[in-house]
């Protein structure tokens, strides 16, 4: 029997994002090291590396509170990342179109001469390559433009759930601060500094 093929890096990233999109919750690393192997087949050893790659690419948010890192990726972030990617692709397509027009003019000038020059041959090859690149960019732009109204509505609903989840965390943090003040007599600003809580920390409207 052949050995079962492991997941590729991209498959791991996709499955990790599924955890966030399906649960719409906030996790610590230790939580994901338990959930990912069981539900998505991602080995516990690779969870941290996969998470970091998603954080580096702006797909997942990470915030340190006290001594722990918390990870989340609400649907609105994915939408913003998609919008940014589309803007980059459209910019590349525009630049490619301008270069295409410039090369076409150069080739027309080269055709005026009677002989097939090396310059004309080089320009023709470059133009052909540019056409291929432009077609690829067009296809990718169309892919990112395709946005189902149902998906938009799902994102709106997910944002609502995400806001409620964030406010539940805010409730918990305020409760812990209140308990610490009563139990140990700590001043509120000392608690904020100790646990890295910003001064403007509050509920999301």
Curated annotation (Swiss-Prot):
Disulfide bonds: none annotated. Its main location: nucleus. GO terms for molecular function: double-stranded DNA binding. Residues 84-173 form a coiled coil. Keywords: Acetylation, Coiled coil, DNA recombination, DNA-binding, Meiosis, Nucleus. Signal peptide: none annotated. The modification N-acetylserine is found at residue 2. One of its GO terms (cellular component) is nucleus. The keyword Ubl conjugation does not apply. InterPro entries: LZ3wCH (IPR040661), Mnd1 (IPR005647), Mnd1_HTH (IPR040453), WH_DNA-bd_sf (IPR036390). One of its GO terms (biological process) is reciprocal meiotic recombination. It comes from the Eukaryota. It is found in: Nucleus. Heterodimer with PSMC3IP/HOP2. MND1-PSMC3IP interacts with DMC1 and RAD51 and binds preferentially to dsDNA. Required for proper homologous chromosome pairing and efficient cross-over and intragenic recombination during meiosis. Stimulates both DMC1- and RAD51-mediated homologous strand assimilation, which is required for the resolution of meiotic double-strand breaks. Belongs to the MND1 family. This is Meiotic nuclear division protein 1 homolog. It comes from Homo sapiens (Human).
């Amino acid at each position: 029997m052949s050995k079962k093929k492991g997941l590729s890096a991209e498959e791991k990233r996709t499955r990790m994002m599924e955890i966030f999109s399906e649960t719409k919750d906030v996790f610590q690393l230790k939580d994901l090291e338990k959930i990912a192997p069981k539900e998505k087949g991602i080995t516990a050893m690779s969870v941290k590396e996969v998470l970091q790659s998603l954080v580096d690419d702006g797909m997942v948010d990470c915030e340190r509170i006290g001594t722990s890192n918390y990870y989340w990726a609400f649907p609105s972030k994915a939408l913003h990342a998609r919008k940014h990617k589309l803007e980059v692709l459209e910019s590349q397509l525009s630049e490619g179109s301008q270069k295409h027009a410039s090369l076409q003019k150069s080739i027309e000038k080269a055709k005026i001469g009677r002989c097939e020059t090396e310059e004309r041959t080089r320009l023709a090859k470059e133009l052909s390559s540019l056409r291929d690149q432009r077609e690829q960019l067009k296809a990718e732009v169309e892919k990112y433009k395709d946005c189902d109204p149902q998906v938009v509505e799902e994102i709106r609903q997910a944002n609502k759930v995400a806001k409620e989840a964030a406010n539940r965390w805010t409730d918990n943090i305020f409760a812990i601060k209140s308990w610490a003040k009563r139990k140990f007599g700590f001043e509120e600003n000392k608690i904020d500094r100790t646990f890295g809580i910003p001064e403007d920390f509050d509920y999301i409207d």
